[in-house]
């Protein structure tokens, strides 16, 4: 059971990079990335299952199999079409008030991927009312709550996780909340200990724990420790959100050339192209104008279509690539209303400073004070805003 639980949980997390809306190709035939033979074999099996489900759409077990596979692939590739495939697989039960619990958990995950956090939490709450010891729902809700900044509630969910989730998964849940509330040093120390004890149980759980550890180390300004954790989290090549989080760490460490190497040929998702564009601009790479124009077109198309899942990425694009601080601040504040990860807080502070509008950061500063968040990537920004106010 643990693998299924963790597969659901990692969709929710991994350094928050996956919260942004990736590239949405207009044609399913569009090639996002060339896959190795093993992945191609998996995709063939997925299409076979899809075809079988098309012939018998009310087969619940088959629908769950297809939906779970689609979600796993969406998580790994940052391809939003996979979440659409998951929703399509669950179509007979999608709109009914009380679907089977297994459907409800997957519906919550898809809703979370679309930033419908309230809808996701409603589904998970309904499950936990009937089955308080449902580990998958409890763990998933804990990370939804972390994303929206409900840290006390997230801590409560982590505390109430049943043994079925496994010791390492439970530790990651609890320790990440500790890190987000001012205790990153002790949380990372404990996480490293737990990884040594339980890290051989499940490779998927271990990679997830390493990615969380990398973010904790980065919060503490421990560059080498973050490098090590990211390297461990990507030993098998890594999924796209984890690679993007690694790229952000490299950018923070002023290593843009390594970003271009890390992400070369990995995906055509927006979250990848954004990091390439930022790194390319810093290096004056000849490809940077192409990446910039491509992202500008995609964001314009998304806005024209009423899609607002890409606010964090678009804000960074406006700030770090285009240099439009006013637009970036507007987007960052809109994003802050939806999600409240450390990267979201940091973005508001960065854009407020760049736009010379420190007052715009008031809500974020209040949130930081309330939660006790201590992050070396954020503290200098707090200090600069305090200087401007004085």
Name every feature range the model reports, one short phrase each:
Residues 65, 106, 140, 173-174, ...:
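Canonical tetratricopeptide repeat
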Residues 68, 75, 109, 143, ...:
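Residue-level recognition of tetratricopeptide repeat
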Residues 52, 92-93, 126-127, 160-161, ...:
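Canonical positions in the second alpha-helix
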């Amino acid at each position: 059971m643990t693998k299924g639980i963790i597969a659901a949980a990692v969709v929710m997390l991994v350094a928050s990079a996956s919260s942004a809306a990736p590239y949405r190709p207009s044609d399913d035939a569009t090639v996002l990335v060339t896959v190795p033979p093993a992945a191609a074999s998996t995709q063939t099996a997925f299409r076979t299952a899809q075809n079988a489900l098309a012939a018998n759409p009310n087969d619940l077990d088959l629908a769950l199999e297809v939906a779970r596979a689609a979600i796993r692939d969406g998580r790994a590739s940052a391809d939003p079409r996979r979440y659409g495939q998951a929703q399509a697989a669950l179509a007979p039960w999608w709109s009914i008030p009380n679907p089977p619990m297994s459907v409800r958990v997957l519906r919550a995950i898809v809703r979370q991927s679309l930033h419908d956090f309230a809808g996701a939490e409603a589904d998970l709450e309904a499950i936990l009312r009937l089955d308080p010891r449902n580990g998958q729902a409890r763990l998933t809700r804990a990370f939804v709550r972390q994303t929206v900044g409900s840290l006390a509630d997230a801590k409560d969910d982590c505390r109430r996780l049943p043994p079925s989730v496994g010791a390492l998964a439970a530790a990651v849940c609890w320790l990440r909340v500790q890190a987000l509330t001012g205790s990153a040093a002790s949380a990372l120390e404990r996480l490293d200990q737990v990884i040594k004890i339980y890290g051989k149980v499940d490779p998927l759980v271990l990679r997830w724990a390493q990615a969380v550890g990398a973010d904790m180390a980065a919060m503490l300004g421990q560059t080498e420790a973050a490098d090590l954790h990211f390297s461990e989290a990507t030993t098998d090549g890594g999924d796209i959100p984890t690679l993007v989080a690694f790229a952000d760490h490299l950018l923070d460490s002023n290593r843009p050339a390594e970003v271009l190497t890390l992400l070369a040929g990995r995906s055509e998702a927006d979250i990848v192209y954004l990091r390439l564009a930022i790194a390319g601009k810093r290096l004056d790479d000849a490809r940077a104008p192409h990446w910039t124009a491509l992202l500008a077109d995609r964001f314009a198309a998304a806005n024209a279509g009423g899609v607002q899942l890409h606010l964090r990425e678009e804000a960074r694009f406006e700030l770090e690539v285009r240099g439009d601080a006013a637009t970036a601040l507007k987007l960052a504040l809109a994003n802050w209303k939806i999600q409240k990860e450390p990267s979201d807080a940091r973005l508001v502070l960065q854009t407020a400073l760049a736009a010379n509008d420190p007052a715009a950061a008031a809500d974020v500063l209040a949130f930081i004070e309330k939660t006790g968040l201590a992050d070396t990537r954020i503290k200098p920004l707090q200090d600069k805003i305090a200087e401007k106010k004085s």
